[in-house]
């Protein structure tokens, strides 16, 4: 299994690595147990995932798939939840590119000449994740700058823990 939400049919290209689960566990969980080291995650997840706008017809399923809330803190559970998963449900590799990334690339390339096409590409990902589609008059889409900001936010929601956000920051800045 390559754990990338929702994985089924979305991975275009990836790399096989049968020891990934153990490596992730050793790095993030083993060190915590043996040394008492604590790795603090993002404190702004409610803002990143816009949880204040969640409703029965508008809930980003990535949020509950990637994080578990424990009081005021969040546990990142996307790659490995616990030690038993290393044997029972190990990660088998890394995704290098997948369908949502292709939609983001398409949306960015279309924005200047075909805003409706750019919006459709972005909404293809958003609606597949349980969110309502954005409309053409949404403030997030009115300028190139606000559109790029929304694409960046989408990458943050879609690809936590992968290093992709750093590359996007280099690209957009």
PLM feature spans:
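Short, cationic low-complexity segments
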Residues: 34-49
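Acidic/polar-rich alpha-helix caps and helix-coil junctions
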Residues: 1-30, 40, 53-173
């Amino acid at each position: 299994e390559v754990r990338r939400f929702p994985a089924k049919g979305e991975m275009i290209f990836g790399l096989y690595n049968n020891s990934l689960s153990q490596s992730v566990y050793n790095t993030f969980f083993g060190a915590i147990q043996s040394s008492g080291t604590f790795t603090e995650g993002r404190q702004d997840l409610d803002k990143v995932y816009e949880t204040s706008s969640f409703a029965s017809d508008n809930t980003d399923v990535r949020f509950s798939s990637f994080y578990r809330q424990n009081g005021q803190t969040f546990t990142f559970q996307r790659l490995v939840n616990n030690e038993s998963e290393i044997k029972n449900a190990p990660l088998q590799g890394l995704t290098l590119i997948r369908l949502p990334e292709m939609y983001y690339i398409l949306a960015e390339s279309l924005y200047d000449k075909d805003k409706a096409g750019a919006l459709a590409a972005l909404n293809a990902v958003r609606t597949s994740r349980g969110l309502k589609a954005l409309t053409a008059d949404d403030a997030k889409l009115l300028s190139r700058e606000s559109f790029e900001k929304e694409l960046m936010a989408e990458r943050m929601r879609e690809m936590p823990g992968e290093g992709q956000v750093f590359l996007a920051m280099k690209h957009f800045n």
